[in-house]
Regions:
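A conserved active-site cap/scaffold subdomain adjacent to cofactor or substrate pockets
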Residues: 258, 264-302
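Alpha-helical scaffold segments that flank or form the walls of functional sites
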Residues: 74-146, 170-182, 431-436
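Active-site microenvironment of metallo-dependent hydrolases
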Residues: 1-26, 30-34, 343-455
């Protein structure tokens, strides 16, 4: 945790909490890593003060599904299909990862998230080729200082994905006992499951029962369109009697109306990744369909091998995609979209917290919650002048506006710079990791063998 008492002053508080509301020239008092008071002119003395003049004070973003391990091969597939991704990343590239590649991937990837104001990350880790790979992934998250859910998945390789007969690795029991005996830590654990259809039905039943035996949440990809594969993942889960409110369903882009009804009726949550879903052809993000059923989606980055690792892109993509779906071919019908900028900010904050079962801890600024706080500079050339604070966050801001980030009251970014991070060392390790991985997959550009000149 951070400083014992911290007072953030003079900022525009966008709390994402209906009771607290928005507070111009607001103050947030933090003690021992938690928020204890929010208001104006709190009259606090003896606390470390941070002047947030010209800034929005907001909760940290929550990314509910990111394959953080892919950071060392960022850009290897900038414009690919889902078929191509499975063939290259899971069928080839992932098999060349050493534990040290996983560590730098998770460490640098978590730093990237923090740099962009993401304070909570669900790390959907399907690079568990050995126990050492798993240990390295967890250590990378710990070293970065992010709040995370480590979602333990299977190793890479096609044998784990095409109606696989291989059960989820039992090593998850060791990991649960070794690292996550308590559910109150900054990093917790979930099971990154394969839907029935990716594994066979008996394996899926085993994996769901394994998660529930360990008393951990489940995160699963469903409804992704792959060529010549027709499968109703959610219906299969339902037919096996495995639906539950402990499960987050990722994508749902090709899920049927019946399947979306099943998610809603079971109390499940959803995570959409709109940029990659349209880039790779998963299918249209089902934002409106989920909302019609009372399921408020969360947002996720997904594959950092192909997608920007910040949430501003995801918010804007979700907003404009769903709004244009309201367009009709009838000129006499007025354009009448319903999704708003406030909705997508909720997706990226409090709805993300709900998808991770962390809504009592994070996702909004309120007394009693953890001090996961972002200071967003709005006295900047791309955001000034401010009229609508939520609009400023969603429509105009980007990572360059993220001035300061706190996780449980501890500063991980201040004055636009990550705290206690040797970036030159990080970049060097990323280059070395990229070269090792991609050279073995015959994907390394010729120029990459030479060090890039310092900028």
């Amino acid at each position: 945790m951070g400083s014992e008492r911290l007072l953030i002053r003079n900022g525009f508080v966008v709390s994402m909490d209906s009771d607290v509301g928005d507070i111009p020239n607001g103050e947030v008092l933090v003690e021992d890593g938690a928020i204890v008071e929010i208001g104006r002119s709190l009259g606090v003395s003896g606390a470390e003060e941070i002047d947030a003049t010209g800034m929005i004070v907001m909760p940290g973003f929550i990314d509910t599904h990111r394959h953080t391990w892919q950071t060392p091969v960022r850009g290897v597939l900038p414009c690919c299909t889902l078929d191509n991704y499975f063939a290259v990343m899971l069928g080839s590239v992932g098999g060349h990862y050493r534990p040290e590649d996983v560590h730098i991937g998770n460490y640098a990837g978590a730093l990237e998230a923090l740099n962009g104001g993401v304070t909570t990350l669900l790390d959907w880790s399907h690079i568990n080729n050995t126990p050492d790979h798993s240990d390295a992934a967890i250590q990378g998250l710990k070293d970065a200082g992010i709040r995370a859910i480590y979602a333990h998945g299977v190793p890479t390789g096609g044998e784990w994905w095409a109606f696989s007969e291989l059960e989820h690795p039992e090593d998850i029991r060791r990991i649960r006992d070794t690292y996550f005996s308590s559910d109150d830590g900054l990093i917790t654990i979930a099971l990154a499951a394969r839907a029935p259809g990716n594994s066979n039905f008996e394996v899926a039943k085993h994996d769901w029962e394994l998660a529930r035996d360990l008393a951990i949440r489940i995160s699963v990809h469903v409804g992704m369109r792959l060529t010549d594969i027709e499968v109703q993942h959610v219906k299969n889960i339902s037919d096996l009697g495995l639906l539950g409110d402990d499960t987050t369903y990722i994508h749902c882009t090709d899920s049927t109306d019946e399947e979306l009804d099943l998610i809603a009726e079971s109390g499940g949550t959803a995570s959409i990744a709109p940029y990659v879903e349209m880039l790779m052809g998963h299918g249209p993000p089902p934002t409106g369909k989920l909302l019609e059923r009372g399921v408020r989606p969360s947002l996720s980055v997904d594959v950092v091998s192909s997608v920007p690792g910040e949430m501003f892109t995801q918010m804007r993509t979700a907003l404009v995609h769903d709004r244009i779906l309201s367009h009709t071919d009838t000129p006499k019908e007025a354009f009448a979209p319903t999704l708003t900028h406030k909705d997508v900010l909720e997706f990226a904050t409090i709805d993300g917290a709900r998808a991770c079962a962390l809504e009592d801890k994070v996702g909004s600024l309120a007394p009693g919650k953890q001090a996961d706080i972002v200071l967003l500079k709005v006295n900047a050339i791309n955001t000034a002048p401010m009229v609508d604070p939520v609009g400023t966050i969603v429509v105009f801001a980007d990572t360059s506006n993220v001035d300061s980030v706190f996780v449980a009251g501890r500063a991980v970014k201040r004055n636009g710079q990550l705290v206690d991070v040797e970036l030159d060392s990080v970049f060097k390790k990323l280059d070395e990791s990229r070269n090792h991985i991609l050279s073995r997959g015959e994907l390394l550009p010729e120029w990459a063998s030479e060090p890039m000149a310092a900028v």
